[in-house]
Amino acid sequence: MKPNPILSKMSKVEKQFFEWYKEVDPSSAYTDGVSECAGKFFIPSKQNLAVAENKLRNILKEAKNKGQRRLFKSYLTSLRFNEPYMVPSHATNAFFAHLVKEGIVSEHLKSLAKKVEEALDAYAKLLPDKKWSIETRIVTCQTTDQLLGILDTILAETKDESLKKSLNVLKQKALKYRKLYEVKGIKQGDFSEIYPILQKTREKIKHKTIYPQLLADMWGYPETSEEIENKATFWLEKELPSLKKVTSKLAKIYGVKPTVEIVAEELNKRKGIPIQQALQFVKETRTVAQKIFEKNIVRITPKYETRVIETPPYLVNMIPTAAMSNFNSLTDKPFNVFFVTTDPRFSPSSSVPDLIQSLLHEEYGHSVNFSNSATRFAANPTFLEIMSSAFSTPITDGISFHREFEFVKLLEKLVEKKTLSSEEAAFLKTLRGEVDTETMLLENEFVMQKWRIMRFLRAIFDVRINMEKQSIADFVEWAHKETGLSKKMIYNQTWIFLETVGYAPCYSIVGDVIRKLQQCALKKGISLQDFNTYVSSLGFPAREIFEQKINEFISRHAK
């Protein structure tokens, strides 16, 4: 494995930042493919954070363009935002990255365990006095349980006694850390335990003073919190009738009451895949689906590699349905891991349309986006623009969100096509099952519309919770009454964003931007494939630069 050729093109200030990045976020650098960072973890002491901030400020002074300044400011903002769930969460990700990339290498894992132990001590000292909300305490317990879970996984696999000793020492430290934030009654950390507590307490999370800055500077939203809530509320009101309409049509076909929850249950009965077969279904279907998406939606780099795995037990609290992680973007062999959750306590995809929805979102949205960008397949992102910074999240989730809409439109075209390829015919057969074409289209539209509504709710949730407008229980009750979606699903699909304040609006906010730009490109004679391939290869610059580059592409290629 060799370094990504882009590293040889770094400017002086990019090289300075890269050295800072390896020092301050070595676990992410290792995930990106920097082998020298194996076994390393940043110790977030007050002194280390101050030194890191001072160094980055000096690098910021050397920035030569807006893109560099925006990214460095994003990292500066994140340095100042520290909450107790962060170190356990980052530590779990670090251990997981080591297992995925190299398996159990005792020296690296012993070093990592020691560093994480020091980091937990440092964080306990850094955040000792603040009275944290019960929600923050629960999330901290959950992320610490994830860390304990992955440690147990390694302990069960390794025969190295010195590694076992190091991991057991870290386990005791993590248990001690967890007790600092312990909430009585939380063991599994699922809906059945947590939601009754939220109904009783109805606390508000104190983020009102920091939230606007996180949106603007860390995540790079041009929109204010008020604009995000207004947009998402408008979309919810606009598209909810579409969900209700398709729900009524399916309910009539199924012979059930026309509610989202009942129709979803009936869809699972009719098109359900047994939990133990869900992973294999995804693996088999993706081989056919990839050819269809590449032919009709987006071209894919020849270096594309994605591995599909079942979500490990220690991650299901934060991956209730599906997720994707990218690795080795700074090497010549980037790859992705696609997680499929099957645990019934959460919100796993269990029907054919739901599993296809997860597949197209995670693979032909996220995975293609990261792979095309890392390999500079159809664009020329800079070193800073292929990093998995906070800026990557709005862009890649916006792409994936819009990909779901594109898929339903593609299905409508395929069923009208006179001559299908063997892959297209096989794919439609899988989707149809034993129903007619009209019912199949309605089922996939239903799933797409249901998830669009959920993404609008996520955006509203993020603003209302973090601007202290509602408690989580109040929001869930409002959203359930407003949409007909189950309280469990709403909770599972919003609670996870407490760990990443400001993330949740990205799907719908950026997805709508991409939709409008795509419409403009199509009107000017640019093909859907050409547009999507370019956008998926652009990397992850600040939003305004991302949009500017797309507009320039449209101007260059208009016919």
Role assignments for model-derived ranges:
Residues 1-559:
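N-terminal maturation segment of proteins
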